[in-house]
Amino acid sequence: MNLLDPFMKMTDEQEKGLSGAPSPTMSEDSAGSPCPSGSGSDTENTRPQENTFPKGEPDLKKESEEDKFPVCIREAVSQVLKGYDWTLVPMPVRVNGSSKNKPHVKRPMNAFMVWAQAARRKLADQYPHLHNAELSKTLGKLWRLLNESEKRPFVEEAERLRVQHKKDHPDYKYQPRRRKSVKNGQAEAEEATEQTHISPNAIFKRLQADSPHSSSGMNEVHSPGKHSGQSQGPPTPPTTPKTDVQPGKADLKREGRPLPEGGRQPPIDFRDVDIGELSSDVISNIETFDVNEFDQYLPPNGHPGVPATHGQVTYTGSYGISSTAATPAGAGHVWMSKQQAPPPPPPPPQQSPQAPPQPPQAPPQAPQAPPQPQPAPPQPQAAHTLTPLSSEPGQAQRTHIKTEQLSPSHYSEQQQHSPQQIAYSPFSLPHYSPSYPPITRSQYDYTDHQNSGSYYSHAAGQGSSLYSTFTYMNPAQRPMYTPIADTSGVPSIPQTHSPQHWEQPVYTQLTRP
C-alpha cells in the first residue's frame, strides 16, 4: 500500500494538471471522466478503504477535508465515486522511486567521496552532537590538508569502484537531472546575499529615490525640520552599511531619546556620520543642487570666494569670520586656510548647549583688547594646537585643526584684501615655508565685525556669523572631516543645540525646493 499511495497522489495531480480545472471548483461535466479532477482529496480518502485500512481513520480525515469544499462539490464528487470501480485502475510497477522502468544508476564515487563517507561514519559515531553541515566542512578542510601518500588509499578505492561500475553498467551515461526552476525563497536568499555587499553610494542613491521629496535629494539630508508630516524620518547620509538600522534611528538610540510623534527626528548628529563615505561619486550623482550656490563652499583656485548674498547670516564664502553687515570688509579674508582660522573664543561658563538664545550682552563679555595669539608647539600630525583667544585665561580649550596644504598664492592673495594689516608675531611652524603670512588684526579683532558680545549666544543666528562660537572646528567634529568633505563638509556643525536652527536657511541649508 505504501508503494501505491504516492503513485495515486501523483496520478491524481497529473490528471488535475491535464484537466486544467482547479480542485475546489470541479465542473459538473467532469463526472463523465473516469478520474474526476476536483476530487483529489476524496479519491485519496476512498482508496484506503479498498486497501484494508481501518475505516475510522479515513472517515476522520474526510470530515476535516470536507470543510474545504462547498456542499454541491462534495455531492458531485460522491456521485461520481459511487459508480467507479477502483480495481480497474492500472498500477504500473515503480522501481527505486523513479517513474522510469529502469532504475536510476548512481555515479561511481570519487576519491573524496570515499574518504568522506568513511570518515563521516566514524566521526558521527564518536561525536553524535556534531551537525552534519559542520562535519562536511571539516571533512573538506581535512581532505585538502592530506598529502598524496595519505590520499592514495582513497584514490585506489575510487578507481576500483569506477572499474566495477563500468562492468556493471557498460552502457552507462551520466545524465544529470535538470534543476528545478529557482524557488522564490532561494531567489530572495540570493538577493539578500547581494544586498549585504552594497556600496554606501548605492544606499545613498536608493534613499534619494525612495524619499517622497527626492526633488532635492541632499536638501532633505540637511533640513530634517521640514519633514514633520512624514511617517519615516528624512533619509540620512549613509554610514557604512554594517547595520540594517536606519542611520537616523541609530542616532536616536545612541542619544537615548524616544522618537517624537509625527516621525519628526531631531537634527542629524554628524559626529556619527563618516562623511568620507560620501564619496565624490555620490556627490556627482546629485543633480538637484543649485550649482552656483554650492560653489561658495568649494575652495577656489587662489581667489577669495564670492560672498553669499542671503538675508540670513551666512559665512561669506566659508571660514571667514564676518557678518553680512560687514561683507565689504569681510570679503577679503574669506578663504582663510584652516591652519590660519582663529580658534573659537570660549563660550561663557554659565551657558549650556541647550540654553535658550541670550540677548546680546554688554561689551564686557567681548575681548577688550586684541589679545596676542601664542603659537603652541606644532603637533606631529601637522594639527596645530592653538590657545584660544579669551579674556579669561582659565578657560583655555585646545582646538585641533586638521591642516590642508594650500598654495602660497592663496595665502598672499587673500592677505592683500585684508583691511587692516596690523601683524602680530607670525606662527613659527618648522614645516611651512617663510611665505606663511602673518596673522592680521582684522582676523582676530572680532569686535570690528560683530555686534558686541552677540556671538556668544548659541542661537544668535540673526546677529552674528560665529555660528555657536565657531564650533565646527571642535575636536569632536574634526577627526572625520576628510578632504573630500570640503564639498559636503558644511554639515559638520553639531546640531545638538536646538532644532530651531533648522527653521531658517542658515548656511548649511542649500536651496529650498
Swiss-Prot record:
Annotated positions of the Phosphoserine modification: S64, S211
Swiss-Prot/TrEMBL keywords: Acetylation, Activator, Differentiation, DNA-binding, Isopeptide bond, Nucleus, Phosphoprotein, Transcription, Transcription regulation, Ubl conjugation
Region described as PQA: 63-103
Biased composition (Basic and acidic residues): 56-67, 160-174
Motif (9aaTAD 1): 275-284
Compartments reported by the entry: Nucleus
Protein's UniProt keywords contain NADP: no
Cross-link (Glycyl lysine isopeptide (Lys-Gly) (interchain with G-Cter in ubiquitin)): K402
Oligomer and partners: Homodimer; homodimerization is required for activity. Interacts (via C-terminus) with ZNF219; forming a complex that binds to the COL2A1 promoter and activates COL2A1 expression. Interacts with DDRGK1. Interacts with EP300/p300. Interacts with beta-catenin (CTNNB1); inhibiting CTNNB1 activity by competing with the binding sites of TCF/LEF within CTNNB1.
Protein name: Transcription factor SOX-9
